[in-house]
Swiss-Prot record:
GO cellular component, one term: chloroplast thylakoid membrane
The protein's name in its UniProt record: ATP synthase subunit a, chloroplastic
Listed Pfam families: ATP-synt_A
Family according to the record: Belongs to the ATPase A chain family.
Subunit structure comment from the entry: F-type ATPases have 2 components, CF(1) - the catalytic core - and CF(0) - the membrane proton channel. CF(1) has five subunits: alpha(3), beta(3), gamma(1), delta(1), epsilon(1). CF(0) has four main subunits: a, b, b' and c.
Organism: Citrus sinensis
SUPFAM superfamilies recorded: F1F0 ATP synthase subunit A (SSF81336)
Superkingdom of the source species: Eukaryota
Length: 247
């Protein structure tokens, strides 16, 4: 009962964290609900970029691929390689999920550095990358948790839960807490890195507005891509782990 209570408290804490506000926010009132408009607007922009890129990629495929087609094929192969390395031979059905996570996070992170969100004025707050908001990163982490529970249950059925008493039943509380803390580590790692990167750039621009921030911005682009890769790789690793049934 203590383990179950602790797990429920962890989930409740994660839900509360998803409501944390950093700075001012702009909301839409829809019925009896307040909708976080800043995150929705920037997320829609990112989704539009991804859908537009996908349309360009599949619009007119050539037998002899063009440079653009080569680029998109390379991205697909890269995502497939990451999925296969972490999940194993049954990686196929999970490539779309891992690819969606990677591309959404990658474009979101880069949008914070490349798109001039700040020039768009809002009644309250300001626009920023979707992954600059804890609500987005918690949602992505919870989706990952649902995915690896589904992967384990779909392959092993209720026998999936036997992993919690391996290699010894003494580790039951630790194994349960491990699964419930994975979303916390995923969400806070991504949120903290993106928020810190944008804050550093803003501070440097305010102090030395011309030359100094440029190298930091390039470093931010690099770390943003690395964070997207880390998130997608860990998500694939968790899914592969749940299907294999060992740690």
């Amino acid at each position: 009962m203590n383990v179950l209570s602790c797990s429920m408290n962890t989930l409740r804490g994660l839900y509360d964290i998803s409501g944390v506000e950093v700075g001012q926010h702009f909301y839409w009132q829809i019925g009896g609900f307040q909708v976080h408009a800043q995150v929705l607007i920037t997320s829609w922009v990112v989704i539009a970029i991804l859908l537009g890129s996908a349309f360009i990629a599949v619009r007119n495929p050539q037998t002899v691929p063009t440079a653009t087609q080569n680029f998109f094929e390379y991205v697909l192969e890269f995502i497939r390689d990451v999925s296969k390395t972490q999940i194993g031979e049954e990686y196929g059905p999970w490539v779309p999920f891992i690819g969606t996570l990677f591309l959404f996070i990658f474009v979101s992170n880069w949008s914070g550095a490349l798109l001039p969100w700040k020039i768009i004025e809002l009644p309250h707050g300001e626009l920023a990358a979707p992954t600059n908001d804890i609500n987005t990163t918690v949602a992505l982490a919870l989706l990952t948790s649902i995915a690896y529970f589904y992967a384990g249950l779909s392959k092993k059925g209720l026998g999936y839960f036997s992993k919690y008493i391996q290699p010894t039943p003494i580790l039951l509380p630790i194994n349960i807490l491990e699964d419930f803390t994975k979303p916390l580590s995923l969400s806070f790692r991504l949120f903290g890195n993106i928020l810190a990167d944008e804050l550093v750039v803003v501070v440097l621009v305010s102090l030395v507005p011309l030359v100094v921030p440029i190298p930091v911005m390039f470093l931010g682009l690099f770390t943003s891509g690395i964070q997207a890769l880390i998130f997608a790789t860990l998500a694939a690793a968790y899914i592969g782990e749940s299907m294999e049934g060992h740690h």
